[in-house]
Structures are given as structure tokens and as C-alpha cells.
Amino acid sequence: MAAYRADDDYDFLYKVVLIGDSGVGKSNLLSRFTRNEFSLESKSTIGVEFATRSIHVDEKIVKAQIWDTAGQERYRAITSAYYRGAVGALLVYDVTRHVTFENVERWLKELRDHTEANIVIMLVGNKADLRHLRAVSTEDAKAFAERENTFFMETSALEALNVENAFTEVLSQIYRVASKKALDIGDDHTTLPKGQSINVGSKDDVSEVKKVGCCSS
């Protein structure tokens, strides 16, 4: 169960990045999850910003530091710093603009080029409330997610549909993979000091966790 907590009260800190084309709704997903706000006049993010929110996972407090940047090509120079240390990602496209879904493959390659193979990835089809304008089918997106071994959800930042679920699923999976990795090496990741970064293991570890609950829509 997710809950708002004081910023300094947490057991683990995970960096999660939002990626995808400009205008797909990344900033509104972030503000909906962290502040329960939505702006119809949202402008393109200039540079980088991040927000935080803590949730409960298995009686531990997991704090997400969620980074957001504009998708325009001219900001690609910040790529390395943006991705560094990320253990989770939400790869966002707009269900009403097919080109944003076509570009998901490029974003995914860039993400994997700059992060560890074990990163937990959620493919997110945003603006699902605009049913009459849909240009990307749920089936096509789900097939892509299964092929690329990522999680998948459709969301609406406007209606707050699945926004909570998408972020909490990513954070829960990061926690579970990290816990399994610690168990495999005979350590207990729940005893690590506050703020210590977590190596969430290999890509196989992520795949194994995915078998439990993948690709809900």
C-alpha cells in the first residue's frame, strides 16, 4: 500500500528515470505520482528535474528519486548523467501518437546502453483517457513489452488511471530483485545502511521476478 512519508524517513533510495518523446506526458505522470497534481498547460521540461516520493514495500520504506527530462534531441547531451545510477525506468509513449510508440525502440536502446542490464523497465502507454484518438493498440504495446522483457501498463495522468500502479510496480520489482540478489549471495539487503545504493543483480534475476506478475494493463 502506497503512502506519503516525510522525505528523510526511508530505508532504501532508488533512482528511477522517465524517458520517451517530448509531449507524451512524462512530467504530468511525475507530478500526479509525487504531488497528485495535473496541469493541462504543461510545457516541455527544460533540462532536468526530479521529485521524490516514498512508499511501503514489505514493511520497508522505499524512497523513489524520479528524474524527468525533455525528450527533444537537443537535450540528449545530458544522457550519461541522467541515466547514471538508475535502477528503474518508465518508458513513456502517447497512445494517440503512433510515432511516439515507434520511437520507443530507440529510447530503449539508449536506456540499455547507459544502464546496467538488470534495470527494471515499465513500458507506459499514457493518455489512455483519449479513447477516441487511440493510434496504438494495447495488443501491439503488450507484444513489444513481452518481446523486450519489460513490464507494461496503460495510464492516464489526467484521470490518475494506473499512475500509482505503474510507479509502485517498478519500485516493488526493484526491491524484490535486490532482495533476491542479496539472498543469493548470503547477504541481507534489508540491513544495509540508509541511502546505500543497491546492485539489483543480473538481467536473469529481473526476468525471474517478471514471471511472477508481468505486463498487467
From Swiss-Prot:
PROSITE patterns reported for this sequence: RAB
Membrane disposition: Lipid-anchor
Lipid-modified residues, S-geranylgeranyl cysteine kind: C214, C215
UniProt xrefs under InterPro entries: P-loop_NTPase (IPR027417), Rab_GTPases_membrane_traffic (IPR050209), Small_GTP-bd (IPR005225), Small_GTPase (IPR001806)
Keywords: Cell membrane, GTP-binding, Lipoprotein, Membrane, Nucleotide-binding, Prenylation, Protein transport, Transport
Motif (Effector region): 42-50
Binding site for GTP: 20-27, 68-72, 126-129, 156-157
Entry's Gene Ontology BP terms: cell wall biogenesis; protein transport
Gene Ontology CC annotations of this record: plasma membrane
Record-stated family: Belongs to the small GTPase superfamily. Rab family.
Role played: Intracellular vesicle trafficking and protein transport.
Protein name: Ras-related protein RABA1g
Gene name of the record: RABA1G
